[in-house]
Structures are given as structure tokens and as C-alpha cells.
């Protein structure tokens, strides 16, 4: 009798399934018998299965048709076969069945509602329900890590050597010892190595110990000499100190050497050596492919480079001899003239004892190298060299690894250097456009300002209230305003284009007596003018400046004198006594610098020719010295002797301003190339300190005139830098320069920030004028 269609047997193959989707997850762990039993059944019934399959194919076709007509929810035999791991290929006459490995052929087919238990007979013959063990996969309810099947704990497995079991599972059942094969089985297992095979046995379960994919990948990386953890980077990016840490100022500002910009002569020699070899045929630039392949094969041969190496003992006591110093220019056979000794120097050298001579030879000059005689002291020098190498002890000097921060001087904390301005106390608003200049009067009560709107305004310092203003021009801006430094008057000077105005503003603190004294000082000089010509001017030539009244309208507002020069005035600086002031016109060329005498209404041009364009000028606070700054240098002149004293070289590309310390021995310079330079006039003409703290040009620099060790600079980046600059009385000590505060408040308009600043004559306060049209008082 032929078997039914539902009892078809499956052919078991050794190939692995192509994907997990073709096999239902219910079949995991369903194989309860060994593969040997399946192989034996397959060999015995091979011929019987062929006949059964042919007879059962027709019955399966009829059942498939009936099942498909009854319900759509019930899968057909072909679909059931696919669910059971069988691939069915239907044809018109026959049905081919291909069995898929990993599926138990004896297990009955299950539908979607299959139960997770089976019915067995107990010892009394009653039915007993045996449930399948739960497989805690990722989709199951148990998401914890899989526990070990053997729950005996961490005890030696030798305790179970005399028992047939090796432990107990979580339900208390004995875990029987698995059967072990003979030597032939072990040999066959080693030949047919499955994936993850190790040849080891798990002592807790007795089963072969196999490796998973992650463990196999770890073993592969170790065998290849790679890092076990693929996420670890064995070569992290090194962070060098001098590139990883951003420095505000360079550790070394030395200029680049010339050899950096010249081609290497050694490389040229190597290249010419290769060129000659190619020309002579010793080097073939092109090799046939056959020779190239042979060379590549030879290069691929690996060998141990340390095979014949003999270990050598390192002698730590050996120190190489120091090298002789290279010869200098004076040892040349044709040295420069400045190296040749004079007659007096030669006689003095010959009178000295050989031990007292600085050099053992005198430079000599020869016309050619063939005329140079033999050196008579060669034997003596070589003997002394040998004696030095033999007798002089040698010391190995270790290179010091010093942190660059430890080389910097220990500066005091800014909190210990107070008082200095920290916050913006008052904001003055009223100008239309930029405020180009600002100045505090000698009494410290009023502030004067000038801007692009052509007006000069006077404000109360503490309240910020405007007390006086005058319109000097409607077309040109007020470039600068400066107060007369003497306290016996209340005189303000302002420059608009080619005109310099002297005025007496009205203020609540100005008494009638002080106002009258100021007007008398300005009017006293008109008695020295004769026929409208200046004293000292050659007859028939135009005077360097014209002193005149500005007009009735301006005189009623307090403007008393107008001085007209030949070009636009950018800078005004007063002498400490208040009788002289200097004006600078950068576009004036010969008449760019002028010195005016207030008591005589006299203007003088001190320079007939000035090397470079004048940028600013200032008087020395104590001595009769006059400083004039061009684009790159600052020249110091003696006004009594009428001679040049020194030329200070800051090293800046374009000087914007400078100021002299009240002590007279130090100088600070601001430049358009973002640098602030401190000069010690007694030390050198070069800068003592160079500070690069700004990102834009430095417009103005000022010392505090009231005895406080403070100075500041204003920049186009919209900030003011406040510094503590202490000048010691002892000339052997260096000045102490500490940056203490950065004042931010002005806005940058059209790449212009803070244009001018000035200190209070007594308090640690300062005012600043910005391109945003505001004036700020910092306290």
C-alpha cells in the first residue's frame, strides 16, 4: 500500500539553507536525532522512496485542488511543504520534491496554530504533556542574557568524573554526559571541520566548543597582527604643543633665513648625479615589462633581516669627542679688509705673551692660494688637540625639556594692580556720524569732542550733559581737538581742514575771571603782527600760516582765532607750558610739521626737507626735545641745539600714533599693522616689548598723566586694551608690563572702531570716541 500524500519523506542534503526566511523559526532545535540515523535510513530506503514519490504525486495534486477550493485561509500542500522546509516544483505531469537540510522529516507537519507541547506515555501508561523548551531569542519575552545550561556553579568538574552526569539544569534535571566517539570519529571530525570548530570541549556541557562570528573575527585580527578592537585607532592624531595651543604672541619673531627661499644645492648635485648616470647608460629610465616583473618577483621574496644579527653590547661610558669649531673669515687667505690688523694692533699682539693672546695667529692677505706658505703651528695645535682629548674630561649634556610657560616671567594678578577702568559709566550721544577726536580738560571737569558733522561739543564728564557746541564747518570734519594744558586758562583748539581754531567755551565751572584771562591770552599776540606778515618770513614770500579773526558770528560763540596753514591738519599737540603747539599735515610735504607760538602769533616750519611723510609729532614732557614720527621711524630733535639726537626704529610698517611717558625715558607706539610697541629710550632704539593683542589697526595710544602706572590703546576692532606699565626708578630693572583689561562697547562701522581716547588727569578713568557716533566714559 502506497503512503499518503501527507506522509511524504524528505531527502536530507548536506548543504546549508540559503536564508533564514525559508525556514520557520519553530524548527530551531527540532532535530533530536543524530545525522548518522538519517544517513542510514536514507541508504536503506533509497529505492523505495523513488517509487513512493511517483505514486503519491497524483494524490497530492487532488488534495491540493480540494484544499484550495474549501478555504483561502488553509494553505495548500505546496505551501505547507514550503513551511516545513520543502521546495515543491509543480509540472503538468509530475511533481518534483527537493528536501532542504536542517528539517526533521519524521516530525509531523504543523499549521500556524501548532501547539508547543507533545503527548507522551508515562510509566503507568497515562498521557503526559511535555512542553518544548523556550528559546529566548531576541523576539521572545525573555530579553536577558542567556544563562549557562549547567547551574552547578564555579566548582571543579573533577567532582563529576565518577558520575554519568555532569551537572544539573535550571529545572533540577541531570545533564547527562554526552557520548564520546572513538579515534576514527575524532579523525573524521577533524577532517570535516565545521564553521567555528576549535577541537576543544566545554567542561560544563561536554559538547564541542565552537566560536561565533565575533570571536572568529577577533582571532582573525590577532593572527593578521591587527588591533583586536576595530574601533580603536592605533595612530591617533598627535597634537604638537606649538601648533595645538594657540599663542597670542609668537615665541620667536626672528625673520625667515635666506636659505628657506633658495633652491637646495645638495638636491641639485643629487639630480645631476642621476642625469649623468642616465647619459652614461648606468641607469635605464625605461625597463622592459619582463625585467620589471622579474624585479617585482624578487622584491616580493621575504626574509628575516635580523637572521644573522649578533647582539652588541652598548657602552654607555663612550662619549664622542667634541668637534673643532669651523674656521672664520679671519682664517681666509684673502680676508676682508676689516679683519686685517693695523700696524698698531700687530705691535700690540707681538708684545703680549703667547698665553695672553686672544688668538694664536694674525690674519694675513695673499693674492692667490698657491702663495700661501705652510702653517708652522700645525704640529703644536694637533698635539694640544690630542692632549685635550686625552686629559680633558667629557660630560654628556642632556637636552632640557622645558615648558615654554615656565620661561615667561611671573606676572602679578590683575586684581592686585587696581585701580584701572573696567566698566562703561556714561555714554555721550549727539554727534551725527563718526566722532574723530576726544579730549579731557586739565581740570578733569569737561570733555571736548569733534566729529564728521563739523561741530565741536563740550560735555560734563560725570553727567554726560552737553554744555556748549559750535558749528565750525558744514563740509569738512573736525579732525582733532586738544585743550591747552595750563590751568590758568580754559582754551580749546580744533582742526577743521586747513584751519586751526582757538576758542574759549562757556562752562559752569568757568568763572568770569578765568574766561577773561583766556581771552586776553589769545588776543595778546595780535600786537606782534605787522601788515599781516609773520615774523621770520622772507619779504615777498607767502607766510607759512595766517592768524586772523574768524568772524563776528563765531566770535560771539567763543571762537576767537583762526589759523590757516597750507594743507589739512590732522594732529595738534601742545607744549607743557601752553605757549607752543605743533600741527601735523601728512599731505603737506615740506610744510607738514609746523610749530606755532601763541603769545606772538608766530608760525615756523622747522624742516626744509623731511625724509618720509610725517604722521604725528609731540614735545618731550621734561626736556627741550621734539619728536616727529614718519611712516616707519620716529626722529628726536634737540630744540636748543637744533640737531638730530636719535632715530627710533619701531619696526612697524606704518606708525599711527605715539606717546611719551611722563618720566621721559619710555615711549609707546601704535601702528596700523595691529602692533603696540614699548621703547626704552635709554636702552635701545629698537622696541623693548612688542604686543599683538588686536585683530585690527591700532589708532591711538596714551599714557596716564596723573602718576598712575597705566597706559591704553584704541583699535579698529572696537576694543580698548588697558595695561599696567610700571617704570622703576632703578635703571637696572626692566619695566613691568601687564595687560589687565579689555574694554568692549563700541560698534565697528565700515571697518572702523575706536578712533581716539584720552585719560583723566587725576583719576583712573578714560574716555573713548568711536565710529558709531558715541563717546564712552570708562571707570
Curated annotation (Swiss-Prot):
WD repeats lie at residues 430-469, 473-513, 564-606, 609-647, 650-689, 693-733, 749-779. InterPro entries: BOP1/Erb1 (IPR028598), BOP1_N_dom (IPR012953), WD40/YVTN_repeat-like_dom_sf (IPR015943), WD40_repeat_CS (IPR019775), WD40_repeat_dom_sf (IPR036322), WD40_rpt (IPR001680). Its main location: nucleus. GO terms for cellular component: nucleoplasm; PeBoW complex; preribosome, large subunit precursor. One of its GO terms (biological process) is maturation of LSU-rRNA from tricistronic rRNA transcript (SSU-rRNA, 5.8S rRNA, LSU-rRNA). Residues 1-124 are annotated as: Disordered. Residues 104-124 have a biased composition (Basic and acidic residues). The keyword Repeat applies. Keywords: Nucleus, Repeat, Ribosome biogenesis, rRNA processing, WD repeat. GO terms for molecular function: large ribosomal subunit rRNA binding; ribonucleoprotein complex binding. Pfam families: BOP1NT, WD40. Residues 15-25, 34-67 have a biased composition (Acidic residues). PROSITE patterns: WD_REPEATS_1, WD_REPEATS_2, WD_REPEATS_REGION. It is found in: Nucleus, Nucleolus; Nucleus, Nucleoplasm. Component of the NOP7 complex, which is required for maturation of the 25S and 5.8S ribosomal RNAs and formation of the 60S ribosome. Belongs to the WD repeat BOP1/ERB1 family. Component of the NOP7 complex, composed of erb1, nop7 and ytm1. The complex is held together by erb1, which interacts with nop7 via its N-terminal domain and with ytm1 via a high-affinity interaction between the seven-bladed beta-propeller domains of the 2 proteins. The NOP7 complex associates with the 66S pre-ribosome. This is Ribosome biogenesis protein erb1. The gene is erb1.
